[in-house]
């Protein structure tokens, strides 16, 4: 499992560090779960390092999930905790976004089945490039 921070967000952070954009523009605000970027026939990731701007196949009901953001030194930690529902859902991708929809993190991985009483928890640590 590996994730990418898209260039659009990296550029926004660089502009923020330079004092050109306000802090709220770079704060992660919500997450989406998806079921794309994985071929169940071959068991392979179809896009293990996504470079576009959204999850490939959003899962209905899992598209506006709250995240917890904390600053640790010069990094930002984004935590996501999603309780499973009554129906099992195979999750193969996660996207974290700012309030205006700019992708902060795009991640793809082999399927994780989410169903109550299980909870999906993940943490991403982002370091600014200066």
Regions found by a protein language model. Give the residues of each.
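Small cysteine-rich, disulfide-bonded extracellular modules of the LU/uPAR three-finger superfamily
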Residues: 1-91, 99-130
